[in-house]
Amino acid sequence: MNDACRKTAGFKISILGRTYALRVSSLPIADGEKIVMRILDEGNHALTLQQLGYWGHSLATIEEAILQPHGVILVTGPTGSGKSTSLLSLLSILNSSAVNISTVEDPVEYKIPGVNQTQVNVKAGMTFAGGLRALLRQDPNIIMVGEIRDTETADLAVQAALTGHLVFSTLHTNNAATALPRLLEMGIEPFLIASTARAIIGQRLVRRLCPTCRKAYEPSADEMKEISTAFHLDQPGVMKRLHELEQKAASQHIGDSIGAALGSTETGIKTLYKAGENGCDKCNKTGYKGRMGIYEVLENSPAVQKMIVANATSTDIQNQAISEGMDSMQVDGLVKALRGETSIEETLRVTRE
């Protein structure tokens, strides 16, 4: 699409035998032309959920949800939070010759062998809603709609779930629980949301600390006070929950132990990690190498269903989910910071509202 104000384009290049798709957007500014490029490695294969950073309650909940024969599973977060990558992994788990998986995407970022992928083309009348309506006549078992942007698409997704399809899609919301009032705002009846939603993922991306040059340190009293406030460590049960997560991670042999980083349930945190001041050759002197996800997965339990029908607030629903075992994105980020996989600063950067 081109006009006087902006230009967007896409093309492919090959570097050292690997093919990359580039999406380029330019905008005229006072100093010239501002360009943003999104680079997609077409040789990338879907990562496992564990490789993406799912574990514990989040992993168990989403693995159970995707085995349901019908319903809606949503992935939420801002632009650039890894939603498409999560969807790619989820669809790849389910992909087999025994099921018909069809998608409507804008654009098709990663091609999945054996999956029928359709690209949105507004000029040709192929919108998300129009594409979804067409897919329903193609006898699909599993449907993925790139994004629910309007009431029509939301309604069609719910109706598809009611008629025996497993539907995946995304929403731009701050966390998992706020996806529910967003659907209500789109005009979906509470009882329909309660009966079709299976699980809602909230996620963010954080930079991964370089394992070669990261530095362990003991937080000062002032820093500990700030961390305690930001992560609500002074609230009843929070430190106890961190110790429970440490025991669970140790039993499942997940990541580095956080036991050494934790004091007693009363004393708080003993050890944290930060990026090396000048980085190293392994991370191009940045202190960080790659990115990883932090997640929360809200299960639509019977109690949550009743709250949806009763028009409960997203805060109340979030608290109910946490009481049932869900760990918030902040807690997941904190655990990964205690393991030395990311930093406290990174977790706060992406989870502060």
Task: Name these PLM-found stretches.
Residues M1-E353:
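Short, flexible helix-loop junctions that flank or precede catalytic/ligand sites
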